[in-house]
Amino acid sequence: MKLIIFAAISVAFMSFDQVLGSMLHGVKSEEAMMIADGSVVKPIDHGGPTTEPDGCQVCIAYNWGCSACQRKKNGK
């Protein structure tokens, strides 16, 4: 009988501890979200192309060479 009472008290204490820990973790998460609410992510300049690509978007995508793109390459 004593073992059953001890087990019931232990289970109740563990449940209370989990609930209390969950509530405290929720408060910490809200504080962290309020702190991180500002501009955390900043744009990165990846040094993309500075000149216009040779050809239209279709030719670039499929590695084609339409007549307009060929004239542009040849300077005509």
Curated annotation (Swiss-Prot):
GO terms for cellular component: extracellular region; host cell; host cell cytoplasm; host cell nucleus. The keyword Secreted applies. Induction: Expression is induced during host infection. It is found in: Secreted; Host cell; Host cytoplasm; Host nucleus. The keyword Signal applies. Keywords: Host cytoplasm, Host nucleus, Secreted, Signal, Virulence. Residues 1-21 form the signal peptide. Belongs to the CPGH1 family. Rust effector delivered into infected tissues to modulate host functions and contribute to pathogen virulence. Enhances leaf colonization by the bacteria Pseudomonas syringae and the oomycete Hyaloperonospora arabidopsidis pathogens in an Arabidopsis thaliana infection model. This is Candidate secreted effector protein MPL124497. It comes from Melampsora larici-populina (strain 98AG31 / pathotype 3-4-7).
